[in-house]
């Protein structure tokens, strides 16, 4: 029974780590130094 509980916690920790990692990377890309390379397609479009 102990093995199943340990596997569950390991899976939960892995999923939380991946979620926080992707969220952190997204925030870094949106607001960090790489954000200077992003372009706004609505600003580029001329009517």
Curated annotation (Swiss-Prot):
The keyword Membrane applies. The chain crosses the membrane at residues 9-31. Keywords: Membrane, Thylakoid, Transmembrane, Transmembrane helix. GO terms for cellular component: plasma membrane-derived thylakoid membrane. It is found in: Cellular thylakoid membrane. It holds the Pfam family PsbN. It comes from the Bacteria. One of its GO terms (biological process) is photosynthesis. It is a single-pass membrane protein. Belongs to the PsbN family. May play a role in photosystem I and II biogenesis. PANTHER family: PROTEIN PSBN (PTHR35326:SF3). This is Protein PsbN. It comes from Prochlorococcus marinus (strain MIT 9303).
């Amino acid at each position: 029974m102990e093995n199943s509980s340990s596997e569950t916690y390991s899976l939960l920790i892995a999923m939380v780590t991946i979620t926080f990692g992707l969220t952190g990377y997204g925030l870094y890309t949106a607001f960090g130094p790489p954000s200077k390379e992003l372009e706004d397609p609505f600003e580029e479009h001329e009517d």
